[in-house]
């Protein structure tokens, strides 16, 4: 299988308006079209400060992350090697890449270089709609579930791109 089938899907939930307030990390590493690594971690956002609107979206509360590690710990232990110099996919990559950059800056971490891909730009529909259409299980606004759905969508896209072409103008 092509190296195109090697990528990392990510999703973050945030505690408040600040993009550096990641409170849950979802990461799915795909190699050769198969899941080889998963991360589903609650992380304590800076000051463990939450806004009610964010809680209403994902259901994560300050008590849930009170004893959770900081993002920097999760980054080094579970994420960095799957992001740096890799293809990174998200459903709305602009949001997730922005959160990653702001959160790493908060911790004075070096910014990774990676190639961005966006399933929202590819499919032009919301994650809930697409998950239903393609029969992908989804617990929407759970970072792990959203990252897994994104990974499955990107695999669908790659398989379509790599499908043998039938018919020819010259037949």
Kindly give the residue locations of the regions a language model identified:
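Acidic two-metal-ion nuclease catalytic site recognized across multiple nuclease folds
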Residues: 1-3, 151-171
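Conserved non-catalytic scaffold segment of RNase H-like nuclease domains
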Residues: 2-97, 101-106, 113, 127-141
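Active-site flanking residues adjacent to catalytic metal/cofactor-binding acidic residues
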Residues: 10, 117, 145
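A structural signal for alpha-helix termini and helix-coil/disorder junctions
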Residues: 84, 106, 125, 156-163
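Non-catalytic, well-ordered alpha-helical scaffold segments
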Residues: 97-98, 117, 148-151
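Conserved beta-strand -> loop -> alpha-helix junction used to position metal-binding or nucleic-acid-contacting
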Residues: 110-123
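Metal-dependent de-N-acetylase/amidase catalytic core
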Residues: 125-159
């Amino acid at each position: 299988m092509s190296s195109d089938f090697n990528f990392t899907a990510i999703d973050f939930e945030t505690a408040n308006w600040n993009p550096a307030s990641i409170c849950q990390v979802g990461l799915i590493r795909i190699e050769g079209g198969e899941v080889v690594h998963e991360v589903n971690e609650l992380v304590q956002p800076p000051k463990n400060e939450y806004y009610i609107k964010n809680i209403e979206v994902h259901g994560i509360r300050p008590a849930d992350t009170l004893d959770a590690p900081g993002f920097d710990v999760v980054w080094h232990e579970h994420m960095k090697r799957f992001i740096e110099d890799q293809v990174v996919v998200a459903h709305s990559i602009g949001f997730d890449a922005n959160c990653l950059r702001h959160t790493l800056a908060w911790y004075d971490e070096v910014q990774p270089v990676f190639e961005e891909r966006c399933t929202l730009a590819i499919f032009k529909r919301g994650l809930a709609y697409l998950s239903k259409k393609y029969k992908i299980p989804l617990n929407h606004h759970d970072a792990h579930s959203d990252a897994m759905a994104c990974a499955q969508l990107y695999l669908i896209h790659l398989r379509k791109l790599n499908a043998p072409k039938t018919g020819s103008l010259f037949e």
